[in-house]
């Protein structure tokens, strides 16, 4: 079993997310809470660099080692880092995160440990929209981020 923690911080958005994976090839479970979000859907992605020296901007693009188009978490073609959306309750401004993903890994050369988790301002269109959809999902500004650390 490998586990990682990510403490995400932004101007008003913050939270803690735990990643766990039983063994290489098994699903990764992602759970935690993000608070301070506006109500609705928000893009939730692993970005390529473990760098927050210039805020969330220095995290680079979505983690995409196979150089394919952006998609949703259940798409046949997607970036490794494409985790889709999290949903924030309009009244509490809290998103309870519970994701099971079969593409990301905490093992090997493609491990997401040491990379940056980014929470976006807007809904990820899962690669189904126009313009930047095939690279960013049109998810908008980066409102919080943090680097995954092994625990």
Swiss-Prot record:
- What InterPro entries would the database entry show? SOD-like_Cu/Zn_dom_sf (IPR036423), SOD_Cu/Zn_/chaperone (IPR024134), SOD_Cu/Zn_BS (IPR018152), SOD_Cu_Zn_dom (IPR001424)
Q: Which reaction(s) are listed as its catalytic activity? A: 2 superoxide + 2 H(+) = H2O2 + O2
Instruction: Give a GO molecular function annotation for the protein.
Output: copper ion binding
Instruction: Give GO BP annotations, semicolon-separated.
Output: removal of superoxide radicals; response to UV
Question: What Gene3D superfamilies does the record tag this protein with?
Answer: Superoxide dismutase, copper/zinc binding domain
Alphabetical list of PROSITE patterns matching this protein: SOD_CU_ZN_1
Q: Where in the cell is it found?
A: Cytoplasm
**Keywords noted in UniProt:** Antioxidant, Copper, Cytoplasm, Disulfide bond, Metal-binding, Oxidoreductase, Zinc
Q: Which cofactor does it need?
A: Cu cation; Zn(2+)
- Where along this sequence does the record place binding of Cu cation? 45, 47, 62, 120
The primary site where this protein sits is cytoplasm
Which residues make up the binding site for Zn(2+)?
A: 62, 70, 79, 82
Q: In the record's cofactor note, how is the cofactor described as bound?
A: Binds 1 copper ion per subunit.
Q: Pfam families, from UniProt?
A: Sod_Cu
Enzyme's top EC category: oxidoreductase
Q: What EC number(s) is this enzyme filed under?
A: 1.15.1.1
Per the record, its GO cellular-component terms are:
cytoplasm
Which Cys residues form disulphide pairs?
56-145
Subunit info here reads: Homodimer.
**Which protein family is it in?**
Belongs to the Cu-Zn superoxide dismutase family.
Biological role stated in the UniProt entry: Destroys radicals which are normally produced within the cells and which are toxic to biological systems. Protects spores from cellular damage caused by UV LIGHT.
For this entry, the protein name equals: Superoxide dismutase [Cu-Zn] 4
* Organism listed in the record: Dictyostelium discoideum
Gene for this chain: sodD
């Amino acid at each position: 079993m490998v586990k990682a923690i990510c403490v995400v911080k932004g101007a008003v958005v913050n939270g803690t997310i735990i990643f766990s994976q039983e063994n290489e090839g098994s699903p990764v479970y992602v759970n935690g809470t993000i608070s301070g979000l506006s109500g609705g859907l928000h893009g939730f992605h692993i970005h390529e660099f473990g760098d927050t020296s210039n805020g969330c901007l220095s995290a680079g693009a979505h983690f995409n080692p196979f150089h394919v188009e952006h998609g949703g978490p259940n798409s046949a073609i997607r970036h490794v880092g494409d985790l889709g959306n999290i949903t924030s309750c309009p009244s509490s401004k809290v998103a309870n995160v519970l994701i099971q993903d079969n593409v990301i890994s905490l093992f090997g050369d493609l491990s997401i440990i040491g990379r940056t988790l980014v929470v976006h301002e807007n809904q990820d269109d899962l690669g189904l929209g126009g313009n930047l959809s095939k690279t960013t999902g049109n998810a908008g500004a980066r409102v919080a981020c943090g680097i995954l650390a092994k625990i």
